[in-house]
């Protein structure tokens, strides 16, 4: 089994709700790190064997295989295929795993993985309700098998998060301390330029908008839970955000001598 190597990892800054990327079409957003990849790496893009992007809520401007759409919008060769992965919040991570597995199995040598999402344009979980105009309240509506197993209890990320917290004895205070630390680390990394090599500016938009400089544990403690009686609040939940990333993964045979790992 061969090894897989990440030789380029680029991303846009992350835009907040109603922020700098809110009106950018997902295909144009996803094209940005793809274009820059080939500005920085000496590689013929026509040699790429697959483009695997993660994206949740693949409806509207994110439908129609957004991975390939981003590639084409970037002006890259139309002989290269693309596919889109939906593993919910782990979609882009799964795209990277699939790319690495393709290389490690020997079926591919050059693959791009990444992801794109504009949550301002396509709100979170919109795909879950998109079938309502066709008479489907949600993806599980009127499925006898689903109802036999789970009943009609609402399917919710917040319920799931609360179940995990209960199973592993994670308190609200534990989560808030972790969230506060996460914001502080992100802000420190921004202020010290640690993200500069990986971020591709979008016009004059240079830095992530999502880390909160003004948040405190005291402010977090004042928030009401999303679901009454539970402990999950907005402060410990992922934000609505927009962004894209592109990672170039190669087999050893395609890595030039100067960049070959020792």
Please annotate each region the language model reported:
Residues 1-74, 81, 89, 163-172, ...:
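Conserved active-site "lid/cap" helical segment
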Residues 87-117, 165-194, 247-252:
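Active-site-proximal alpha-helical scaffold in enzymes
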Residues 55-109, 151-157, 214-239:
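Conserved catalytic cysteine-centered active-site region
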Residues 253-262:
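Single conserved hydrophobic/aromatic residue that forms the stacking wall/gate
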Residues 11-39, 57-60, 83-97, 120, ...:
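Active-site pocket-shaping loop/turn-to-helix segments
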Residues 110-163:
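Flexible glycine-/small-residue-enriched beta->alpha junction loops
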Residues 10-12, 23-32, 40, 174-252:
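N-terminal extracellular/periplasmic Venus flytrap/periplasmic-binding protein-like
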